Regions:
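Extracellular serine-dependent O-acyl
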Residues: 1-34, 53-65
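Conserved catalytic region of serine esterases and O-acyltransferases that act on ester linkages
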Residues: 33-118
Length: 118
């Protein structure tokens, strides 16, 4: 991405992939073989998508509105361990970790942040 943004007129990159990589270094990445995906390729329906949404919000809306995603009360409570539709529910306990993964991705979009303390 750095190469593409340097060679084009693209000014903003939404680092959703980086936020997922950050999340994978946290305690939320359970040893279930799914790696926070729903099918080993796509983000799981719960916490991974929540982190991606927080990244989009922080990248596009926060700079224009000054509104922060912290304190957002939305929770996705569905849980599934299906190998075709895995979903880690978003809870009051893990939502701040996903939001932190998004924050760190926006701060350092081209580097993975170690979140093992979260």
């Amino acid at each position: 991405m750095q190469k593409i943004t340097a060679q084009t007129c693209i000014d903003v990159v939404i680092p959703s992939g980086t936020s997922l990589q950050n999340l994978r270094t946290s305690s939320l990445n359970k040893d279930n073989g799914m790696d926070l995906t729903r099918d080993l390729y796509h983000m799981d329906y719960g916490i991974s998508r929540y982190a991606a949404a927080a990244t989009v919000f922080r990248t596009l809306l926060t700079p224009c509105t000054g509104i922060s995603v912290e304190g957002n009360g939305y929770r996705y409570s569905n849980s599934s361990t299906s190998t075709t539709g895995y979903s880690t529910p978003v809870t009051d306990a893990n939502a701040p970790v996903a939001i932190r993964a998004a924050l760190e991705a926006c701060r350092e979009p081209y580097a993975v942040t170690d979140m093992s303390k979260f």
